[in-house]
A protein has these predicted regions:
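N-terminal amphipathic, basic helical "cap/leader" segment at the start of enzyme domains
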Residues: 1-34, 40
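Acidic, glycine-rich active-site loops and adjacent beta-strand->loop/helix elements
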Residues: 8, 37, 90-94
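Alpha-helix capping at helix-to-loop junctions
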Residues: 20, 39-40, 75-83, 103-106
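A glycine-rich helix N-cap at a beta->alpha junction
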Residues: 22-33, 101-116
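A charged helix-plus-loop insertion that forms the helical arch/lid used to bind
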Residues: 25-26, 51-55
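Small-aliphatic-rich amphipathic alpha-helix that forms the alpha element of a beta-alpha
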Residues: 31, 54-100, 113
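Short, flexible, mixed-charge acidic loops at enzyme active sites
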Residues: 41-50
Length: 116
């Protein structure tokens, strides 16, 4: 999952929480790249099946998917001439980030990506 915000106040709140990256406030767009461990469970439940890999495998797959999405977002932004700054520090402030972006249970931030 990717949450996109152009809300300067929300972007500033992320920068303030991190405290060591003030340049984040200058980004016109912030992507929050998330892992989603709900999706497999929801699909299985929809089809009336047990989620056979409901283990650390689910977490690892969600994390890897998010990392791939982050990498491809960086490449796409570069192709468009946009600068990027990946922000792993969002994981150091989980409660704030989850609240600020209204993340549902089972969705967790992997990294932010400042674009501009």
């Amino acid at each position: 999952s990717v949450v996109v915000t152009r809300d300067a106040a929300r972007i500033a709140a992320v920068a303030d929480a991190i405290g060591t990256m003030p340049w984040i406030k200058g980004a016109p767009i912030l992507l929050l790249v998330c892992g989603d461990i709900r999706r497999g469970r929801q699909v299985c439940a929809h089809h009336g099946r047990a989620h056979a890999n409901d283990s650390i495998d689910t977490f690892l797959n969600a994390s890897a998917d998010a990392a791939l999405a982050l990498g491809f977002a960086v490449m796409a932004a570069d192709a468009l001439g946009l600068g990027t700054c990946p922000i792993s520090y969002v994981r150091n402030h989980l409660a704030l980030i989850e609240d600020l972006f209204a993340l549902p249970a089972g969705v967790f931030p992997v990294a932010g990506l400042a674009l501009g």
